[in-house]
Curated annotation (Swiss-Prot):
Matches recorded under NCBIfam families: PRK10859.1
The encoding gene: mltF
Organism: Sodalis glossinidius (strain morsitans)
Organism domain of life: Bacteria
Protein name: Membrane-bound lytic murein transglycosylase F
Family: In the N-terminal section; belongs to the bacterial solute-binding protein 3 family. In the C-terminal section; belongs to the transglycosylase Slt family.
């Protein structure tokens, strides 16, 4: 998955095209403020989005998601409130835009040239490839000519354009179904459940959904990476497009976009089927007995994150013991346990209480210059390799002209702490930095799996209730 090095070019290109369209098609008068003026007069930015891992979802009854986060920041930038409409498929999304029920479609949509006769696009904020997905355990096709079963894609998706081109150029026998009522995510879930043989989906969505449905497997990419963008109405969007360009440029310049990418996309890679499947099994078998403890002692962090930390430490085994003598659900050392007033490290409640308290203290020691939503990652690195070595990583980051308050920058320096050419420059010397890096990344993946698992469980319960 490509990040913003490529997308600066895309943003610049869009800016040039937008400027040209303004000069050639719009008389210079106040009318070009169009939809932007209406949004400000209304005091409300209306977006339509999808219930999907990257776009919009709820955590502890609070909305989240890459697109939601960007949209909320854009609404703040405009000085208006944000109104979100969650849709279930692409047809509903574009109907909202065409019927003036939405100002922007913020749903991690892939750039599709076929839609540009009626809609326009905002800047790209990441890029993805299109992948053929099948269920693990079934024969893996080597190309589109190997398909033996039903292939379905969502109506209105960019995948249809690609399939038409491939059918014309290379695979004349290629056939597929178009679903008008199911989203790409729903089709992926049907593949995972064995109710559909194949579908096409973007690489980011597949990577995230594999955390909940590890039986999803990628056969191959059918496209190069393509930009992901927002859609606007073409007829009245010049002022809004210009505002979006300025807003996205600011996010790139001040580092916020890089932080958001790290938050929502930084843990997508590194999928391990066996590890993910084992974790999901443990959620069913072991977590219910421990969940009340994680909820009780989580305090300043989400209990699901505390549970993920504990799983990384001990695989939720209260009697776990390492070769170095750390023990319990949170794998506390004897000196650390003593400092926290923990008498029995193998007592589940004492261990969770002690681990949560130790992590809280670690977060409190961190400088206020670190963004609040990133402190947890610094604290976890310190929890694993020691606070002093985390300070070394920050100092090394600053020395290399990086941002010592940005987890995106600091995490890249963690592996350097085990390399002589770098740790000789530090105050506290050698550290197992790669281990700390892997530690934090694993926890983030476990948290994503747990959040997704619980969301699906809630959805299924709601469907049964209906």
């Amino acid at each position: 998955m490509k990040r913003f090095k490529l997308n600066y070019f895309i943003i610049g290109l869009i800016a040039i095209l937008l400027t040209w369209s303004l000069w050639t098609t719009v008389p210079w008068r106040n009318a070009h403020q169009d939809n932007l003026a209406a949004i400000k007069a209304r005091g409300e930015l209306r977006i339509s989005t999808l219930d999907a891992p990257l776009s919009y979802y709820s955590v502890n009854n609070q909305p989240s998601g890459f697109d939601y986060d960007l949209a909320q920041r854009f609404a703040d930038y405009l000085g208006v409130t944000l109104k979100v409409r969650v849709r279930s498929n692409l047809n509903q999304l574009f109907d909202d835009l065409e019927n003036d029920n939405a100002d922007i479609l913020a749903a991690s949509l892939i750039y599709n040239a076929e839609r540009l006769n009626r809609f326009t696009v905002g800047p790209s904020y990441y890029s993805v490839s299109q992948q053929l997905v099948y269920r693990l355990g079934q024969p893996r096709p080597k190309n589109l000519g190997d398909l033996r079963g039903r292939l379905a894609v969502a109506s209105g998706s960019a995948q249809i354009t690609q399939l038409r081109q491939l059918k014309k150029k290379q695979y004349p026998q290629l056939a597929w179904e178009v679903s008008s009522d199911l989203s790409s995510r729903s089709l992926l879930e049907k593949v995972a459940d064995g109710k559909l043989d194949y579908t096409l989906a973007d690489s980011a969505s597949v990577g995230l959904l594999q955390r909940v449905h590890p039986q999803l497997a990628v056969a191959f990419d059918i496209t190069e990476e393509k930009p992901v963008t927002w859609y606007l109405r073409r007829s009245d969007s010049e002022g809004l497009s210009a505002a979006l360009l300025d807003f996205f440029s600011q996010l790139n310049d001040n580092g916020i976009m890089a932080r958001l990418e790290e938050k929502y996309l930084g843990h997508v890679g590194g999928f391990d089927y066996v590890d993910t499947k084992t974790f999901l099994n443990a959620i069913d078998a072991t977590l219910p007995a421990l969940q009340p403890l994680f909820e009780r002692y989580a305090h300043d962090i989400d209990w699901k994150l505390l549970a993920a930390i504990s799983y990384q430490e001990s695989h939720w085994d209260p009697l776990a013991t390492s070769a170095t003598g750390v023990r319990g659900l949170m794998m506390l050392t004897r000196p650390t346990a003593d400092s926290l007033g923990i008498g029995d490290r193998t007592n589940a409640e004492q261990s969770v209480r002690g681990g949560a308290l130790y992590l809280s203290r670690m977060m409190q020691r961190l400088p206020d210059t670190i963004p609040e939503d990133e402190k947890i990652w610094f604290a976890l690195a310190a929890y694993n390799m020691g606070y002093a070595h985390m300070l070394d990583a920050r100092a090394l980051t600053a020395k290399q002209q990086g941002n010592a308050d940005s987890w995106v920058d600091v995490k890249l320096r963690l592996p350097m702490l085990s390399q002589p050419r770098y740790y000789k420059q530090t105050l506290y010397g050698y550290a197992r930095g790669q281990q700390a890096y892997n530690y934090v990344e694993n926890i983030r993946r476990y948290e994503i799996s747990l959040v997704g698992y619980l969301q699906e469980k809630e959805k299924k319960a709601a469907q049964l209730a209906d």
